[in-house]
Amino acid sequence: MLNRYLDISTEVKEALEQGKPVVALESTIISHGMPYPQNVETAMNVEKLIRENGAVPATIAIIKGRLKAGLTAEEIDYLGRAGHAVPKASRRDLPVLVAKGSDGACTVTTTMMIAHMAGIQVFATGGIGGVHRGAETTMDISADLEELGQTPVMVVCAGAKSILDLGLTLEYLETKGVPVIGYGTNELPAFYTRKSGFGVDYELDTPEELAAAFHAERELGMKNGMLVTNPIPEKYSMDHKVIDKAIEQALAEAKAQGIHGKETTPFLLAKVKDFTGGDSLESNIQLVYNNAVLGAKTACALAALKG
C-alpha cells in the first residue's frame, strides 16, 4: 500500500533489480545540517564517493508529497536552497506531509523507513539521534532509536551526537535488541570525537565482517536494524574537552531560550559550530564522507554475499 507513494529513481531501481549495491542517504543533513552551499556540495560529494567505491547512492527525501528514493542534482539543490523552510520529517509527520503534498527532509528514522520500503539495506549518515540529557524528566528520546529497533536496515554513522546522553542511548538500544558495532574500535565514537568512554557490543574490522553479521541478522528473521559506529578520521577528530565545553554552553542557551523537541538538535549543532569557530562543521563534513565510503564498501560486500 505504501508503495503507491514511493518513487524510486531509474538508476536505483535498476541497481536493486540487478542485485547491485545501493546506499541510502538522508536529507536533513542537506536542509538542516549545514548552511548553503556547503550542504549541496557535501551531498554531491557523498554521492560521488559512493559511486567511486562501487555502489549506487540513493538520497531520500519527500518532495511534493512523494517519497523519493534517489534524488536528481536539481532536487538536492532545491532542498539545499530551501534549507530550514523544509520541515524535518520523522515517522509521525509522514502521513500529513504525503496527504498535503508537502516537502520533507528525512531524518534517520524516515530514511530507514523509506529505504526499507524500497529494498535498500545499507544507510550511511553522520550521527544518530538518541536519549537527550535530562530525558528522565523531559522524555526527549529520538525516534531514531525506535526505528533501529523495528526496521531491518544497517545504519553506518560516527556514533550518537555528543550533545546526547550516550550511556542512556546505549541502554535504550540494548532494550530494543539493536547490536552496536564498533568499526575497528571497541569504544563508542561520539560524532566529533573518536572516544566517548563507553564500550560497544562488538568490534568488527572489515566491511566483509559487517556484511556477514547483517546478513546473519536477516537470515535469523530478526526485524531490528544494526548500528555500525565508525570513528571520525583522526585528522579531523576534535578535542573532547573543547567539544564538551561547547556543548555545555549550547545546552545552557537552549534551556534559557526554551528550545525543545525537534528544534533541539539543529539549535545545539549550530551553537557548537559557533563556539568552535566553524571547526565542527569541517569535522561534520569529513565524518560523513568517511561513513559514505564504509557504507559503500559494506553494501558491495553484502551484494557479493547474497550474489
PLM region descriptions:
Residues M222-N290:
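A C-terminal functional module that forms or caps the active site or interfaces directly
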Residues R194-E219:
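Anionic-ligand binding region
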Residues S27, H32-M34, V40-V96, E219-K235, ...:
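Glycine-rich nucleotide/cofactor/substrate-binding loop typically near the N-terminus or early
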Residues V23-L25, A58-I62, G104, V122-G127, ...:
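General beta-strand structural signal in soluble alpha/beta enzymes
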Residues M1-G19:
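N- or domain-start disorder-to-order transition segments that initiate the globular core
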Residues T107-V108, E136-G149, V153-E174, E208-A212:
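Active-site glycine-rich loop that binds ribose-phosphate moieties when present
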Residues L71-P152:
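Divalent-metal (Mg2+/Mn2+/Ca2+)-assisted nucleotide/phosphate chemistry catalytic cores
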